[in-house]
C-alpha cells in the first residue's frame, strides 16, 4: 500500500511580514535558513511558498543534507510555470496575476530567466498583471475591493493573446481560483472562460514534490 504524505508547515520566527520586493525576499532567507537547517534531515521534500524567484530555493538545494539524500526542492513560482507549460496547448500562452506593481518587472524578469532566452520560450508567456495590493491586503482589505482588483487584472491579462493558463502570483491568493474563473467567464464567455486553467502554485508544488519523492527524481 502506498504511504500517505504528511504535510508540515514552517514560518520563520522573525522577518518581513510580507514579501513585497526582492529585498524582502533576500532578508527572509537570513531568518528562514538558520531555523530550517536543524530539520532538513526530517523531511523528504521542501516547498518554498513565496511567489518569486526566491533565493531560498537554490540555497536549500546546496545544503549537504539535501544533496546527499537527493531531496527535491522547489518554489511555488517554478512549480506554477512548469505546470502551466504542461497543461496549455502549443499555441497558447500562460500569464501571471500578482500583487503590487513592482512584481510586474520582477516576475517578468524571473520568468524569462526560468524559461530561457529562446524565441519560442518567450512566445509561451503572456506577461504579468498586478492588482496594486500587497500580500497582506489580499485578506485584510475589503473583500469587494480585492475581488474587483483581481478580476480587473485577470481581464487585462486575457487581452494579451490566447491565454490558456493563469498563475496565481502570490501564496496569499490561495483559494481565489473561483474569483479568477468568474473574470475569465465574464471576459470570454462561458465556454472559453471555463476552459482556462487556473494554477495555484502551492498545489502545483505539492503535486510535483510528491511525485519526485515517490519516483526518486
Short names for language-model regions:
Residues 3-16:
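A short beta-strand-loop structural module common to alpha/beta enzyme folds
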Residues 14-21, 134-139:
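A short acidic, helix-capping loop that chelates divalent metal ions and anchors anionic groups
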Residues 21-41, 145-153:
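Glycine-rich, highly charged phosphate/nucleotide-binding loops
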Residues 43-59, 76, 165-175:
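N-terminal glycine-rich "phosphate-gripper" loop used for MgATP/nucleotide binding
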Residues 60-88, 183-206:
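Short, acidic/small-residue loops that bind anionic groups at enzyme active sites
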Residues 97-169:
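Active-site rim beta-loop-alpha module in soluble metabolic enzymes
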Residues 155-157, 162-189, 195-196:
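A C-terminal functional module that forms or caps the active site or interfaces directly
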Residues 202-217:
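Glycine-rich phosphate-binding/hydrolytic loop that grips phosphoryl groups
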Amino acid at each position: 500500500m502506498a504511504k500517505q504524505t504528511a504535510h508540515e508547515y514552517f514560518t520563520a520566527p522573525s522577518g518581513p511580514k510580507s514579501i513585497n520586493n526582492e529585498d524582502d525576499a533576500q532578508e527572509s532567507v537570513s531568518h528562514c535558513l538558520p531555523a530550517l537547517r536543524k530539520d532538513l534531515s526530517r523531511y523528504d521534500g521542501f516547498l518554498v511558498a513565496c511567489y518569486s524567484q526566491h533565493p531560498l530555493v537554490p540555497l536549500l538545494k546546496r545544503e549537504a543534507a539535501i544533496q546527499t539524500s537527493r531531496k527535491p526542492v522547489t518554489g511555488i513560482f517554478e512549480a506554477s510555470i512548469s505546470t502551466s507549460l504542461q497543461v496549455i496547448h502549443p499555441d497558447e500562452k500562460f500569464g501571471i496575476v500578482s500583487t503590487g506593481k513592482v512584481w510586474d518587472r520582477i516576475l517578468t524578469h524571473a520568468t524569462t530567466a526560468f524559461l530561457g532566452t529562446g524565441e519560442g520560450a518567450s512566445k509561451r508567456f503572456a506577461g504579468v498583471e498586478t492588482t496594486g495590493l500587497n500580500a497582506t491586503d489580499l485578506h485584510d482589505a475589503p473583500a469587494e475591493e480585492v475581488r474587483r482588483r483581481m478580476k480587473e487584472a485577470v481581464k487585462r491579462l486575457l487581452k494579451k493573446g490566447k491565454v490558456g493558463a493563469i498563475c496565481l502570483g502570490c501564496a496569499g491568493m490561495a483559494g481565489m481560483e473561483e474569483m479568477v474563473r468568474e473574470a475569465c467567464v465574464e471576459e470570454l464567455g462561458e465556454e472559453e472562460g471555463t476552459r482556462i486553467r487556473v494554477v495555484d502554485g502551492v498545489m502545483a508544488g505539492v503535486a510535483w514534490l510528491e511525485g519526485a519523492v515517490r519516483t526518486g527524481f
